[in-house]
A protein has these predicted regions:
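Nucleotide-activated chemistry modules centered on ATP-dependent adenylation/adenylyltransferase
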Residues: 1-32, 42-341, 345-356, 360-539
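Conserved G/P- and acidic residue-centered "switch" motifs that form tight phosphate/ATP-binding loops
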Residues: 38
Length: 539
């Protein structure tokens, strides 16, 4: 590193610290630092704590409360959550030792809002770019809940974020759009009475690493280890910080991003793959499980053909110039071409499709489903196509994962955890309880979660009968036989039994009757409603 660069970074750091001091001392509005464990949030957190320690030496009065929060989604990359936990503990010890008004904590989603409750419990499709349900529920909501509690106590708050200009064009546009001219703070996008301060906004990536590697972490963290994590996540292609401009175009060393190990928003998890290639081989089963989830997302055999609320919708099918219909390959789903052969529509696998044509095509398709007692909660595709008056063709849209697929997901997850060559816990027992509660609502009365768990673990874990209704296999067979004899939907009957059990002992039947009515509406009445054509509106 040149002397000139040394002077440049020193001047930048000095200017940044002076700005932090001025803003900190000007009022008593509490600060909330968002810490993710990455380089930028680590830099922002460290430079603020370094500045507070300087103010302490300067005998300045430190009366403003500084909160540091980190969102643990409970599916974070293992090495990152370990770093976060050590950092939070280290910061709290430092604050206590130096009498700093700093308090660090980890926030988490409620168990029923977590990844496994939504994916395996409710059957949400794996997150992708168009249906990214995970971020709000698992990361933003817990942080917002904490922020709201601080605002409720103090009236307002300032969020400190490690965002920088030059990270991306979209990030730069966001920063520009929320900047208030002549002010130190930016507008918060969603929360009233809160503002955003970005102390390292003018830092480059090299500035961040220069600061971290030139200044020892005040709470005892290892910034060299952090840099190694970034290097490992990129297959061990470690590179020096100060590179030529040509070198910088060829590598992204030190510019990686960490996320959830189970993330399916990207097609390939380069970070997890990089860790494995760098020698952390016990992560391989996690990558295998993640890749399997990615592969089955659009597998029609593993998805319901209705929404969780019982309604159905139709998705447009692409039509070729010769009139053939084509369902594109996606994930494990093979490409399927449907041809009109002398009035019969037959696909690439020799299967016939039922086609309903005209302005009443949707209504006729719904009637067909009801009359033939087709269970849309199963994976089997009823092979229904409608041709509307616009001359376009549509097929049934996909809904949540089927209950059987969710059982398969849990089985593979617990098998992965049981065979993992590391004590890291992939799913908490509290999450298993939530999954069983949700499965009960889907008609699972066998306590399947506990049964699956016992295949891999011989401990005292059990799900209380207070949380679920448990029937023996003999009970279920008898109930099923009765339903067959009376020509009644066995699955619906089990779900109605669940409702009765939930409201047992209530002095009034009003709520029970409302729940029963809603369930019947889900199963039959919603089928009569007009469907939508957005394939990601599963719920």
């Amino acid at each position: 590193m040149s002397i000139l660069n040394d002077l440049d970074i020193s001047k930048l750091v000095e200017t940044t610290k002076n700005k932090i001091k001025r803003i900190y001392l000007q009022d008593n509005i509490p600060w909330i630092i968002g810490y993710s464990g990455g380089k930028d949030s680590t830099c922002a957190t460290q430079i603020i704590i370094d500045t507070l320690l300087e103010l302490k030496k300067e005998k300045s009065k430190l009366s403003k409360k500084v909160y540091i929060i980190s969102s643990d989604t409970m599916v974070e990359t293992p090495m990152i959550i370990n770093t976060i936990e050590r950092t939070i503990n280290g910061i709290n010890s430092l604050a206590k030792k130096n009498n700093l008004p700093v308090e660090a904590s980890i926030v988490r989603p409620d168990y029923d809002r977590g990844f496994w409750a939504n994916l395996i419990g409710r059957g949400y499709p794996c997150p992708n770019q168009t249906f990214r349900w995970c971020t709000d529920r698992m990361k933003i909501e817990p942080a917002n809940k904490f922020t709201e509690s601080v605002i409720g106590e103090y009236g307002e708050a300032v969020m400190i974020l490690g965002v920088r200009e030059g990270e991306s064009n979209s990030r730069d546009r966001v920063l520009e759009n929320h900047t208030i001219e002549g002010k130190d703070f930016m507008r918060h996008t969603t929360q009233a009475n809160s503002y955003v301060f970005a102390p390292i906004r003018q830092f480059t990536k090299d500035d961040v690493w220069n600061y971290l590697l030139s200044n020892k972490s005040p709470w005892g963290g290892d910034n060299e280890e952090l840099f190694k994590l970034y290097s490992d996540s990129l297959s061990g292609e470690e590179c020096p910080i100060m590179m030529s401009e040509e070198d910088k175009k060829k590598t992204t060393c030190g510019n990686s991003r960490f996320g959830c190990w189970v993330c399916t928003v990207v097609s390939e998890d380069k970070s997890l793959t990089g860790f494995i290639r760098s020698g952390i081989t016990w992560l391989k089963p996690l990558l295998d499980y993640r890749n399997w989830l990615y592969s089955i997302r659009d597998d029609e055999d593993k998805r319901m053909k209705r929404r969780a609320n019982g309604s159905i919708y139709f998705c447009k099918i692409n039509k070729l110039e010769n009139g053939d219909l084509v369902i594109s390959a996606k994930g494990n789903r093979s490409k399927n071409i449907i041809k009109n052969l002398n009035g019969e529509w037959v696909d690439s696998f020799g299967t016939k499709w039922n086609v309903f044509v005209g302005d009443k095509s949707e209504e006729e398709a719904r009637d067909y489903i009801v009359k033939n007692n087709i269970d849309l909660t199963l994976g089997e595709n009823p092979k229904i196509i409608i041709k509307k008056v616009d001359e376009e063709f549509y097929q049934l849209g996909l809904g949540p994962f089927t209950l059987e697929t969710r059982k398969e997901m849990l089985t593979k997850l617990l098998m992965t955890q049981a065979n993992l060559e590391h004590p890291h816990q992939l799913i908490k027992q509290e999450e298993l309880v939530e999954i069983q509660k949700l499965w009960k609502e889907s008609g699972d009365l066998e306590n399947s979660v506990e049964k699956i768990y016992k295949k891999f673990y011989n401990d005292d874990f059990s799900i209380s009968s207070d949380d679920i209704t448990v029937f023996s296999n003999d009970d279920l067979k008898i109930l099923n036989d009765i339903c067959v004899e009376k020509d009644f939907d066995a699955k619906l009957f089990m779900e109605l039994l669940n409702i009765e059990r939930d409201f047992a002992g209530y002095s009034s039947r009003v709520e029970a009757q409302r729940a029963i009515k809603n369930k019947l509406s889900q199963e039959y009445l919603a089928l009569r409603e007009k469907g939508e054509t957005n394939e990601d509106k599963y719920y």
